[in-house]
Amino acid sequence: MAYAADQIEMITRIVEEAGELLPPQAPLGYFSHHNPLHALEELPFQRAVEHASAMLGTEALQTEEAFAAHLASGRILPRDLAAVLEHHGDRAGAVPGRHLPVGDQGPRGAGEEMLDGDAEVVPGGPTWNEFRLARLGLFIDVPRGAGALWALADGGELHRVHPLVTEARREELTRQGRRRFATTERRTRRTRRSRAARLQALRARLLAQLWEDLRRHAPPPAPRPAPLRRRDQVLEQFGVDTDEAVHPVLIRLCAAFLDQGVAAWEMPHREKGLLAAFRHLFGTLGAPREACWAGLGGQLRQQLRMNWSAERTVAWALWALQVPVHAWADTVRAALVSLRGWAGMVHQFECRPDRAPSRPAPARLMDYLAVQLTLEVVVSHNVLARLIGPDARPEDLGPLGPPGAAQGVLATGTTAQDDLTQGEQELRGGDLELAYEAFVLAQVMDVETEVLGHPRWARAWLRAVAEFDAGRRRWLLHLAYERRYRTQVLDALSAHDRRFPGTVPPPDFQAVFCMDEREESLRRHLEESHPQVRTYGASGYFGVAMAYQGLDDVRPRALCPVTMTPRSLVVERAVDDGELVAYQRARRRKAQLQHTISAARGRPARAAAYSAIAGLAELVPLAARAVAPRAAGEGVRMLGRREPARPLARLVIEAAQDHTPSTGPAGDGAQAGEAGELVPGVGAGPLRLGFTVEEMAEIVDTLLTTIGMSGPLGPVVFVIGHGSSSVNNPHAAAYDCGATGGGQSGPNARAFAAMANHPRVRAALAHRGRLIGPDTWFVGGHHDTCDSSLAYYDTDLVPAHLRPALTAATDALLTAVQLDAHERCRRFESVGPDVAAGTAHAHVRGRSEDIGQSRPEYGHSTNATCVIGRRSRTRGLYLDRRSFLVSYDPTADPDGAVLTRLLLSAAPVGAGINLEYYFSRIDPIGYGAGSKLPHNITGLVGVMDGHGSDLRTGMPWQSVEIHEPMRLLVIAEAEPERLARIVRENPPLRGLVEGGWIQLAAWDPSGPETYLYRDGAFEQHQPENLRFPVVARSEHYYAGQRDHLPPAHVLAAFGESPDAVIDRPGTVAAAGAGAAQPTRDAIELPEQASGPLPARDGQ
């Protein structure tokens, strides 16, 4: 069959569009947080999650049961429900598939779109507003699908009063029954039955009549979604899932094709692409022998002879499956998302081959689809021949199209409806789920059941229930859930501003950290233990977009946001060549031994000997790491000290004057390419070794200006990147710095410090008006967020007269990092609530060494806010490790250019992290990676459940179990008018804000007022509570607490000692109580009047 060029072009376009819907997750080593629904960001958040839910079968929001638990615990308050109903109640989303006929429907007339909030739903019943508010507070477990038939078929559910009915309402139902069945009630009184039995029978009769009234007038159930694949029709009509045959073969093919050197044997013809390798492997070497694969080898040999392209193969398969052209796009999309983890990884290798761990495979999504559809054609043909007959055709299953199409014929000649009993068919006459929900609500709410016997009011009641369906309720509950936390944070910012409007003391030293919310606690503890410090937050690559190659790296890696491609290469070069040679020789010997052992595993002749010898040799170290991980880690480090030490090294940051691209090793091991040549781990070349002096001056000046570091500098300025170290953790990169594309940002901090210390760079900065004197030295550092350690780079270069200041500063940082570990431990169930700080620090070090630890740290879990503004306004505010903190000084940004730059960088990065955790938490199976326990690394590209499943994308359950799924609240210190203008003028930001992917608030730079962006404009937030706990130190507040904590004021950050706290009037508990006491030390300070604040430090 000839295929028109326009069909091939259409298929190309369809595959390109479908590829955007696949998970954009990179291989494990380059894991970078992203919005799983990035392709739908042009839609409003609510519509996007609903669309994805329908397309992928995933959850859009938390379940009603989860929200009911939040209501019961006080996480959502009744006033939150009332507030969201007032503002969002009539815009809570469409009602999917359950519309009653327009006409005689009670309170709604023909053509009306919304019920009047103050109108009664039925005479004598609740108003529409009362109905919705009451319904939000009720969790009714409505049986669904076949479960509804099973639960209601025996009638037991229909004759018992629902458990949600209060005693008062139960008595009212009894009175209604007596009125309605007065004659029968008088006759039953003459019987010998007990009074309780008579009342029970009366209520049962009333409920039976109520059920009949509602069931009789219930609308038809919503039609099922139209089948998009022949597989869906075969499964529905015969109970046979053809994917169970196709997917295992496709998984093995993809695993072998994308393998990054783990497999002992390389896939034949891999260099020609997946489709060519598949044809040669199964067409010439032999296809599987199962009956469902009959004819596969012949078909593939024919494709080889005719040299079909992937596009032509796809077109042939769609025609062979008899898919109408108008359904091609839906069918292709459904096929790809059926195994979207592997399809997405193939697409990533096609789009970003530079992120392949070792060797990019020539992957194409079109090849993948051609293989998948070819397998589906063969399996479908053989399955239909077995189930229907040898002449069966795919079109015999019925059309792939809109609802209402003719149904396919089952092999037995019957339909599913014929298998139902007469009673079940009667139950299925209307929407059974809707009728049951209306039935329960009529019992619970203040409704006269006799009124519902009238057809008009029965329909009105059913319509009210349908209008306020689960989708609307869950959306409003989600808004109430977000509102409670948002109100707490905005209230706390206003209260903190009123209580502590003063400036901070001159600094002994300064420290710049990543904006990461895990650094919030470290900064807070540092400020508490050493109030003379000033801390700043910035994007973790610190403006240094580079490809980096350390001494231990085989090739360079990009350390910058994934949206950027570095043009400069920074390498680490040993100071002493002799030390380098000895070090590399020892590493090479160790690597050769490991390679020999690994290679032996894949060779049958050596497998038995390896298992006997290597197994015994590895038993003791394995047991030691499992039983005493920290001691085992120390032992490994002690043995490592017997090998040549890592040589002293420096970064090569300055480019040569001729700006020649680095096209070879050049003595540094760099593998940079010519223009257009792919550099694995980096992108397309060329890469130039180092930065020019002017470029370095621009990097330093831009960062210092952005974070508001102006005025005199302290003797030491730390720039501290971060990363995470753990063992047996496939998702380790997910715990590293998102701003460096899943890498560790310590090298960026080190490079920035080297630039800021460079004499020629300082001279260039002086020409720009920024003076950095000889009494200031920048020190790069690295914070390990898992074992809570700090390391510093190039400290031997610190001038002698500044070493005392460096020692004092590092001592303060050591204290802070120990307290940070102590705070982290409150979340770990394996740690007692009264653990000491030193013990806590040892515990987190042990977690990083434990091969059996599924929760080495919680990463970005619990992230919820991003505050862009001066640290002096949030200093001393306990934010529970939940807030990204970005330093910004609005007084030094008259035109808003700096704020625009920050919003365009920090908001997308924060939103990507936040939404990754959001979706992985609400649907750990559909969006998340599920539990870590069955994970198996495959080919260094991803993890599967066991030996053969789809690639699991997103975050593992153990990483998100304590996370509260909310959209990120971005709070910028700026006038509402300026912030609104920035949003309007920048489409990427406008899409995030107006689409509802993030929440945006403005914080007045000159007062405590905050404003929330809603419906295209800012509205002033009205605080509900300005009295928050006041504590001496953070540990007095969180000690003994496992759950999330609201904000609190911490006095130690302002240099106030516990003794001073005890002397304050209004002290309820001694502030000097031990950290193990779960007290709040609720010291109430007098509130200051709202109004302009004193001049602030520009920090």
Swiss-Prot record:
One of its GO terms (molecular function) is zinc ion binding. Disulfide bonds: none annotated. Residues 175-194, 1071-1099 are annotated as: Disordered. Its cofactor is Zn(2+). It is found in: Cell membrane. Residues 176-194 have a biased composition (Basic residues). HAMAP family: DabA. Part of an energy-coupled inorganic carbon pump. Forms a complex with DabB. PANTHER family: INORGANIC CARBON TRANSPORTER SUBUNIT DABA-RELATED (PTHR38344:SF1), UPF0753 PROTEIN AQ_863 (PTHR38344). Belongs to the inorganic carbon transporter (TC 9.A.2) DabA family. This is Probable inorganic carbon transporter subunit DabA. It comes from Parafrankia sp. (strain EAN1pec). The gene is dabA.
